C-alpha cells in the first residue's frame, strides 16, 4: 500500500486561499463570464446579490493522467457546480457519471491534511471534515477531529484512467466552500403565525439554480430538528409546477402546483411573505402563480404581519442598587408597574418579555414570575436551579444544574409542566435560553468529556404550554469553559467561556452556519443579546457591564447586580 499527498492538493489550497483574499485575483484567475444563454438585466447590487455568478473553472482530465491525478482532479473539479458538475463528471466512467449524485452531501474539510492511499486500482482519500452539508442544505459542524475515509475505484476507459466507483456528494475545502456555496435563509412561521422563524441552508452560489433550490426547500419544509416547532403557510403537497424559478428584473416568478389552490386569501398572503423573505437575497419581489395563473395577492395588514427577528432596546435593562430598569448613562429608568416588584426580590438573573409587563426572576428564594398586574408568583423552589429562561407566552423555564432532563415550564397558574427533553450525553446544564420567537431553545450542557452546545425546537400543547423539545442538534462550543449562552438574533447564539484565569472568549455562531470567535472582557460572567451596534453585552463578576468596541471592551456601568435578557421591545 502506498500513501501520498499529491501536489494538486497544495496547489488547489493556495488557489482557494487566494480567492478569499482577493476578489481581483478571483475574477482574473477563477471566475468566468457566462458564454451562453440569454442576456440578463442586472438588479441593483445593494438590494439583490444574485446577478453575479462566480464559478471555479477546474481543469478537465489531462491525457495520460495517473490514477492519483484523476482522483485529485475529480475532487477539485467537484467544487464547481456549473452545468450540473459537468467537468467533475468527465473524471468518471460514463455509467458512474450518470449515476453520481453530487447533491447528496458536501464534506467541508480543512484542505490541509488530505492523504491518498491505494491498493491496486482501489484508492482511498482521508479528509479532516470541519462541517457537513446534507441533501437539504443544512450545515452541521463536525466536532470530531478524526479523519474520514472516502473510497474510489478506477478502471481504464478508452485508454485513460477514469473513476468507476465514487461516493455521492462532493468534498470542498473550507475557503473554497465559502466562495462557491452561499448561505440562504429560509423562513417558516411560529405555530400562531406571529413570527417568521429563520432556517439557514447552504446551496451552490449560482443564479440559475439558487432561486429554484430555495423555493423547493421552502416547499419541502423545515430542517428536521424544527419539525413541529414551526409551520409553513403552504398547503400539504404543494410543489413547483415547473422545476425552475426564474428571476428577471429582480422579480422571482414561482409557479405552484394545483395543491396550492386550496389556500384562502390569508393563507396566500402568508405564502407570499414566506417566499419573499426566503428569496430576499435573490429577488426584490415574488410573483406567485398556480398552474400558470398569476395570483393577485394584497399585502397583509400590519396587525396580521408576522414579526421577523424582533429587535431589543439599545439600552440594557439592569438591576443596579435598589433600582431596576432601562440604563441610560448612569440613570436607571423604571419600567412602569414592574421595576419595584423585580427590585424587591434582589434579583441575580432576569428575563423581561417584549411587552415589559412580565419578567422571570431568579433570587435567593427561587424563581419567580413577576407581573405588572397581580402578585409575584414563586414558580420554582428546587435547589440548584440555573438562571431561568422565559418566553413571550409567559412561561418560565427552570431546571436544576445537575438534572438537565428535569426541565419544567410554569405559567400564571403556578402549575409546573414537565418539558420532555433528551440531551444526549448530558450530565448537567450550565445555561439555557429561549429564542425571542419562542420556537427554539439553546443550552450549554456538561458531559462526561467536557461541554456541549445544543439547540432544539419547542413543541407546545393546548394553551401554548411547552411539552417537549425536538431531538437537538449540536453546535460548536468554542474554547474554554462555557458559562453563559444568549440569543443575539433570530439565527445566532453567543457563548461566553472562561479561557484562562480571568480571561474569557466569546464564540458567536449562526445556527446552521459558521462560527466567529473574539476575546471577551476580563472576569466575564453573563452574556445577553443587545440592540444597537453591539450584538451582545457582558456582565462581569465585579459588577461592571461591558460592551464590545472596535479595539476591546468598554465599561457601560458599574455596581450592576444583574443584566436582563430582553425578548423584544414594545
UniProtKB/Swiss-Prot annotation:
Q: What is its main location?
A: membrane
Q: Which PROSITE patterns match?
A: PROKAR_LIPOPROTEIN
- CC annotations in GO: plasma membrane
The leader peptide range reads 1-29
Q: Where is the lipid attached (S-diacylglycerol cysteine)?
A: 30
Q: How does it sit in the membrane?
A: Lipid-anchor
Where, subcellularly, is it found? Answer: Cell membrane
Top-level taxonomic group: Bacteria
Is Cell membrane among this UniProt entry's keywords? yes
Q: What residues show lipidation of type N-palmitoyl cysteine?
A: 30
The answer, when asked if Membrane is one of the entry's keywords, is yes
Entries under InterPro entries matching the protein: GerMN, Lipoprotein_LpqB
Give the residues annotated as coiled coil. Answer: 257-287
Q: What are the alphabetically sorted keywords of the record?
A: Cell membrane, Coiled coil, Lipoprotein, Membrane, Palmitate, Signal
Task: Fetch the NCBIfam families from UniProt.
Answer: PRK13615.1
Protein family per UniProt: Belongs to the LpqB lipoprotein family.
Instruction: Supply the name of the protein.
Output: Lipoprotein LpqB
Amino acid at each position: 500500500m502506498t500513501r501520498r499527498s499529491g501536489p494538486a492538493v497544495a496547489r488547489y489550497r493556495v488557489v482557494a486561499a487566494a480567492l478569499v483574499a482577493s476578489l481581483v485575483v478571483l475574477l482574473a484567475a477563477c471566475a468566468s463570464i457566462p458564454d451562453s444563454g440569454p442576456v440578463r438585466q442586472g438588479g441593483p447590487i445593494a438590494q439583490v446579490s444574485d446577478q453575479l455568478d462566480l464559478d471555479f473553472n477546474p481543469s478537465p482530465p489531462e491525457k495520460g493522467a495517473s490514477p492519483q491525478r484523476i482522483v485529485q482532479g475529480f475532487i477539485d473539479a467537484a467544487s464547481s457546480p456549473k452545468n450540473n458538475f459537468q467537468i467533475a463528471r468527465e473524471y468518471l466512467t460514463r455509467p458512474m457519471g450518470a449515476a453520481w449524485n453530487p447533491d447528496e452531501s458536501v464534506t467541508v474539510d480543512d484542505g490541509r491534511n488530505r492523504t491518498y492511499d491505494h491498493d491496486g486500482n482501489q484508492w482511498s482519500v482521508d479528509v479532516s471534515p470541519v462541517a457537513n452539508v446534507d441533501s437539504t442544505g443544512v450545515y452541521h459542524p463536525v466536532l470530531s477531529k478524526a479523519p474520514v475515509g472516502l473510497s474510489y475505484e478506477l478502471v481504464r476507459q478508452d485508454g485513460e484512467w477514469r473513476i468507476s466507483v465514487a461516493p455521492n456528494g462532493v468534498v470542498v475545502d473550507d475557503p473554497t466552500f465559502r466562495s462557491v456555496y452561499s448561505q440562504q435563509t429560509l423562513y417558516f412561521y411560529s405555530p400562531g403565525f406571529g413570527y417568521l422563524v429563520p432556517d439557514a441552508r447552504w446551496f451552490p452560489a449560482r443564479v440559475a439554480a439558487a432561486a429554484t433550490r430555495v423555493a423547493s426547500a421552502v416547499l419541502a419544509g423545515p430542517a428536521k430538528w424544527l419539525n413541529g416547532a414551526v409551520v409553513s403557510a403552504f398547503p400539504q403537497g404543494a410543489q413547483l409546477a415547473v422545476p425552475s424559478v426564474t428571476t428577471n428584473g429582480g422579480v422571482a416568478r414561482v409557479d405552484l402546483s394545483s395543491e396550492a389552490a386550496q389556500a384562502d386569501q390569508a393563507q396566500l398572503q402568508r405564502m407570499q411573505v414566506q417566499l419573499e423573505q426566503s428569496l430576499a437575497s435573490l429577488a426584490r419581489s415574488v410573483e406567485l402563480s398556480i398552474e400558470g395563473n398569476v395570483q393577485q395577492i394584497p399585502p397583509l395588514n400590519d396587525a396580521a404581519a408576522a414579526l421577523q427577528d424582533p429587535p431589543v432596546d439599545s439600552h440594557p435593562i439592569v438591576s443596579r442598587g435598589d433600582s431596576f430598569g432601562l440604563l441610560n448613562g448612569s440613570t436607571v429608568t423604571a419600567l412602569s408597574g414592574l421595576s419595584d416588584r423585580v427590585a424587591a426580590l434582589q434579583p441575580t438573573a432576569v428575563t423581561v418579555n417584549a411587552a415589559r409587563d412580565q419578567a422571570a426572576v431568579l433570587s435567593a428564594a427561587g424563581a419567580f414570575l413577576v407581573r405588572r398586574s397581580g402578585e409575584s408568583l414563586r414558580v420554582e423552589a428546587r435547589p440548584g436551579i440555573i438562571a431561568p429562561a422565559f418566553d413571550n407566552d409567559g412561561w418560565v423555564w427552570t431546571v436544576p444544574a445537575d438534572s438537565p432532563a428535569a426541565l419544567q415550564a410554569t405559567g400564571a397558574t403556578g402549575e409546573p409542566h414537565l418539558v420532555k427533553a433528551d440531551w444526549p450525553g448530558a450530565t448537567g446544564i450550565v445555561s439555557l435560553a429561549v429564542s425571542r420567537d419562542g420556537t427554539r431553545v439553546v443550552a450549554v450542557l456538561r458531559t462526561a468529556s467536557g461541554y456541549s452546545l445544543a439547540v432544539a425546537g419547542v413543541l407546545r400543547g393546548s394553551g401554548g404550554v411547552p411539552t417537549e423539545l425536538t431531538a437537538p442538534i449540536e453546535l460548536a462550543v468554542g474554547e474554554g469553559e462555557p458559562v453563559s449562552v444568549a440569543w443575539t438574533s433570530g439565527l445566532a447564539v453567543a457563548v461566553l467561556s472562561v479561557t484562562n484565569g480571568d480571561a474569557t472568549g466569546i464564540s458567536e455562531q449562526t445556527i446552521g452556519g459558521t462560527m466567529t470567535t473574539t476575546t471577551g472582557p476580563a472576569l466575564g460572567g453573563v452574556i445577553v443579546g443587545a440592540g444597537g451596534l453591539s450584538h451582545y453585552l457582558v456582565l462581569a463578576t465585579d459588577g461592571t457591564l461591558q460592551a464590545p468596541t472596535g479595539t476591546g471592551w468598554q465599561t457601560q456601568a458599574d455596581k450592576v447586580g444583574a443584566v436582563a435578557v430582553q425578548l423584544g421591545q414594545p
